[in-house]
C-alpha cells in the first residue's frame, strides 16, 4: 500500500553534516523524499510534538536535544513507507541496531540517535500535519 510517513533528521545529523548520507539510505530503500524543510524547533513545538512521552524520564533530555540545533523534517512516500522506514532507521538504541541501518551506521548513542519516524498510519498523519500545511502538501502537485 502506498503510504506517507514523517521523518525527522535530528540535530546530531545536521550538526555532523551527514544529512546527505542519511538521505541516501532513505532513497536507496526505495522511499521518495517528497518534501523537506529545515527548521529550528521551539521548546513549545518540541514539547507538543513529543507530548505522548511527557511522563517518561527521557522527556526533558529529549526536548533539550531536539531544540539544540536545526532539524530536517521530511515526508517520505512509498509502498509500506511506515514499516519500511522503521527498518531503514534501525532499533532506537544504536547498540541494538543492525549494521546497514541509519542508526546502526551513524547514531552515537540512544539520545543522539539520528532520526525519528512515524510508528503508525495514525501517527504519520498527525505528525505530517504538525509540520506541513495542507498548502505545502497540495502544492506538490501544482508546480
UniProtKB/Swiss-Prot annotation:
Keyword Glycoprotein in annotation: no
Pfam families: NDK
EC numbers, comma separated: 2.7.4.6
Spans through the membrane: none
GO biological process annotation, one example: CTP biosynthetic process
Key words, A-Z: ATP-binding, Cytoplasm, Kinase, Magnesium, Metal-binding, Nucleotide metabolism, Nucleotide-binding, Phosphoprotein, Transferase
Molecular-function GO terms, alphabetical: ATP binding; metal ion binding; nucleoside diphosphate kinase activity
Catalytic activity field: a 2'-deoxyribonucleoside 5'-diphosphate + ATP = a 2'-deoxyribonucleoside 5'-triphosphate + ADP; a ribonucleoside 5'-diphosphate + ATP = a ribonucleoside 5'-triphosphate + ADP
Residue sites binding ATP per the record: 10, 58, 86, 92, 103, 113
Co-factor requirement: Mg(2+)
Keyword Oxidoreductase on entry: no
Highest taxon above the source species: Bacteria
SUPFAM superfamilies for this protein: Nucleoside diphosphate kinase, NDK (SSF54919)
Native source organism of the sequence: Ehrlichia ruminantium (strain Gardel)
Family membership noted in the UniProt record: Belongs to the NDK family.
Function statement: Major role in the synthesis of nucleoside triphosphates other than ATP. The ATP gamma phosphate is transferred to the NDP beta phosphate via a ping-pong mechanism, using a phosphorylated active-site intermediate.
Protein name per its UniProtKB record: Nucleoside diphosphate kinase
Subunit composition and interactions: Homotetramer.
Cellular compartment(s): Cytoplasm
GO cellular component: cytoplasm
Active-site residues, record numbering mapped to chain: 116
Amino acid at each position: 500500500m502506498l503510504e506517507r510517513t514523517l521523518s525527522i533528521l535530528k540535530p546530531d545529523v545536521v550538526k555532523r553534516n551527514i544529512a546527505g548520507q542519511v538521505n541516501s539510505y532513505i532513497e536507496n530503500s526505495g522511499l521518495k523524499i517528497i518534501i523537506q524543510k529545515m527548521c529550528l524547533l521551539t521548546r513549545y513545538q518540541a514539547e507538543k510534538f513529543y507530548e505522548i512521552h511527557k511522563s517518561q524520564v527521557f522527556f526533558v533530555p529529549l526536548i533539550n536535544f531536539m531544540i539544540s540545533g536545526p532539524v530536517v523534517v521530511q515526508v517520505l512516500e512509498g509502498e509500506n513507507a511506515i514499516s519500511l522506514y522503521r527498518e531503514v532507521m534501525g532499533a532506537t538504541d544504536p547498540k541494538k541496531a543492525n549494521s546497514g541501518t541509519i542508526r546502526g551506521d551513524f547514531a552515537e548513542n540512544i539520545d543522539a540517535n539520528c532520526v525519528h519516524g512515524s510508528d503508525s498510519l495514525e501517527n504519520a498523519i498527525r505528525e505530517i500535519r504538525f509540520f506541513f500545511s495542507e498548502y505545502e502538501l497540495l502544492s506538490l502537485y501544482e508546480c
